[in-house]
Amino acid sequence: MKVEFMQGNQACAKGAIKAGCRFFAGYPITPSTEIAEAMARELPKVGGYYIQMEDEIGSIAAVIGASWGGLKAMTATSGPGFSLMQENIGFAYMTETPCVVVDIQRGGPSTGQPTMASQGDMMQCRWGSHGDYEVIALAPSSVQEMYDFTIMAFNYAEKYRIPVFVMADEIVGHMREKVILHDNIEIINRKKPEEKPCKKPYPFDKLIPEMPVFGEGYNVHITGLTHDERGYPDVSPETHDKLVRRIVNKIRKNKDEIIKWEGENLDAEIVFVCYGSPSRTVKHAVRNLREKGLDVGYIRLITVYPFPDDLLKKLKAKKVVVPEMNLGQIYYEVERVCKKAEEVILVDKIGGELHRPEELERAVLG
């Protein structure tokens, strides 16, 4: 075990390599560029590959191709680049391609605030592509978690054959803290079919089929069209229903294993629901409010998606407070679920600055 002092983006790169990532394709964009710089420097040392593409469309396409070539692959970007990736991210869902996309969020829309923090891409990571699919998205709030959650993202991607998002922001990406580089970390690798050439690489009777890859003797056919068990196009209603339901259900039926959170005093009259950088402020505000005699708790979402409906439905709080560095995105998910609460309060903040504890306290005290 080693302890190092580093930037969040650097921790992300270290976590990726620890997880077994051996391919990175990207296009420089503030505030994520340090991830690309670190991967360009470190991947060749471990036999990996770095390629700077012409844009973010090409970047995610290269990542998908590398994954089907048998490599653990990732890219990193920010809001404008994330928008460009959405079509190919949809292709990755349909082809069940394991990969990791790190989004260091900045202020938008459009070019927005390249050097300032935001959480404005949270709805996009869930609904950015068309069609029916489920998402796994992690929200780190520290440099340590940039390292840990990147490893977790690769494990989820490999286990469930799905693109996984690490939804950080400029604050976490650029802050510097100590990071414990653990020696004994579980690393999950994708399963491959035992049969070659593998007549049915997409069997409908398996929730998560093994993944054949190019160059290893498998019969591999990949298409974004609705496809049958062989991977060949078949747009019949029956085939589409079986395929898409399986793609959706492999996440829905495993949500209890996927969903991660932390919290305190969930039976309180006032509960904060938070994620990412604002979680740091929430912990200060909760402590201050308790010192004033209030019954306060919090839930921090580690996985924002799949959304923890069952957890939030159990809350008995009269007041649920949702701080976000946007004008309300996850707030609407919380409002949808927390029907028992008398109030669901959004404490929004844009402009690139993190909430201050007193702002959250005022939302509670009125």
Curated annotation (Swiss-Prot):
Any Gene Ontology biological process: response to oxidative stress
Transmembrane segments: none
Enzyme Commission number(s): 1.2.7.3
Molecular-function GO terms, alphabetical: 2-oxoglutarate synthase activity
Top-level taxon in the UniProt lineage: Archaea
Top EC class, one word: oxidoreductase
Catalytic activity: 2 oxidized [2Fe-2S]-[ferredoxin] + 2-oxoglutarate + CoA = succinyl-CoA + 2 reduced [2Fe-2S]-[ferredoxin] + CO2 + H(+)
Signal peptide interval: none
Record has Oxidoreductase as a keyword: yes
A Pfam family matched in the record: POR_N
Keywords: Oxidoreductase
The protein's assembly and partners: Heterotetramer of the KorA, KorB, KorC and KorD subunits.
Protein name, UniProt field: 2-oxoglutarate synthase subunit KorA
